[in-house]
Amino acid sequence: MANVAIVGAQWGDEGKGKVVDIYTEYADDIVRFQGGNNAGHTLVVGNEKVVLHLIPSGILHEGKRCIIGNGVVLDPEVFIKEIVKLKESGRLTDDSCLLLSESLHIIMPYHKRIDIAREARSGDRKIGTTGRGIGPCYEDKIGRRGIRLMDLLNRDVFARRLKEFLVEKNFLLEKMLGEAPCDYDQILEEYSGYAEVLRAYMADTALIINNDLQAGKKILFEGAQGTLLDVDFGTYPFVTSSSTCAGGVCTGSGVGPRHIHEIIGISKAYVTRVGSGPFPTELFDADGDRLRDAGGEFGSTTGRPRRCGWFDAMVIRYAVRTNGLTGIALTKLDVLSGFDSIKICTGYTLDGKALETLPSAPEAFENCQPVYEELPGWNADISGAKSFEELPDSARAYVKRLEELAGCPIVLVSVGARRDQTIILRNPFL
């Protein structure tokens, strides 16, 4: 028996959705434990592309229980739209296979309004927020001013808490951000309508997950964003507002750490980042444009073009250490086909001195200079490779070198967007 956590090993957008989709076959429950609809998973099933922002990727498999845990912040409108779309396509036929934690926090209209207004006033200090209200919702959770799902489903409690909190939120919007206030009656009616839909999905998910663990079922924990966006261990302040690392599994789902047997970090064969913040290997030349175009590097949530750069072994070693990774799933190796040579960042220098790890201060991180080694590329189309041995010699050498630099075994190699374009070297569930 194995329970597996999936986390991003870079700055998000590493291809977690595809890997989760593959591993779902071996799991009974798929659990999201942090984040909100600021992340998007893009899955290609046959010739169909499916983009999910809240509902776990496992929903595309019949007979699997998908759980959105207490560590997630939920936009009811987005969740309901995803449900409707899945039902219309015949992919959600049993509501009992999708559960929401009664303790998760609800994103309110004022969270989104505040998020957008703050970013607009930030000038050249923009974080790069998606404007979905994620950060302000987590602020209220920590400040004990949040509205949980269980509160939303009790109209009297919801009305009282909304009225209390809206006084402060409207003061902030009007007096400090120069925005129009939110309307109490409008929010009350709109969200009371959402509550009736959400009621069918609410449960004590921590209890359910632990009961399933006791029964010997296999759990797959699905992370969002990436290690370098973690609120504590990421490139602060250019981070998200939740714990994206493996430690967030426990607090975001209600399970103890002894139940997590494998932690798989997802990494592209190069690096991308959306929004502001340090990125030592970022490319501003034709190679960067080529990676962006070949990899389709545009955000599934925002549509923004992603910043692209060469593989950064410093980042991956940091992710291995911070998460305790037991394996790495390497995605988008096929995007590198056609490059005459490929660079790998093996270390950084700062003011002429070699660094042992990533600097904590963003100002120092911004000034880091990457140290590169160069490997020969390959011209063959590898998207049809079914085994590691079928890859060109230089592609195999590249993967092996990344594994050496990471200090962690590569357990999966993705050579295309489809499920069947995957080489599994070791299955963490078996």
UniProtKB/Swiss-Prot annotation:
The keyword Amino-acid biosynthesis does not apply. IMP binds at residues 13-16, 38-41, 130, 144, 225, 240, 304. The keyword Ligase applies. GO terms for cellular component: cytoplasm. It is an enzyme of class 6 (ligase). It catalyses: IMP + L-aspartate + GTP = N(6)-(1,2-dicarboxyethyl)-AMP + GDP + phosphate + 2 H(+). It is found in: Cytoplasm. GO terms for molecular function: adenylosuccinate synthase activity; GTP binding; magnesium ion binding. Mg(2+) binds at residues 13, 40. GTP binds at residues 12-18, 40-42, 306, 332-334, 414-416. Substrate binds at residues 300-306. The active site is at 13 (proton acceptor), 41 (proton donor). SMART domains: Adenylsucc_synt. It holds the Pfam family Adenylsucc_synt. NCBIfam families: PRK01117.1 (NF002223), purA (TIGR00184). Belongs to the adenylosuccinate synthetase family. Homodimer. This is Adenylosuccinate synthetase. It comes from Pelobacter propionicus (strain DSM 2379 / NBRC 103807 / OttBd1). The lineage of its organism: Bacteria, Pseudomonadati, Thermodesulfobacteriota, Desulfuromonadia, Desulfuromonadales. The gene is purA.
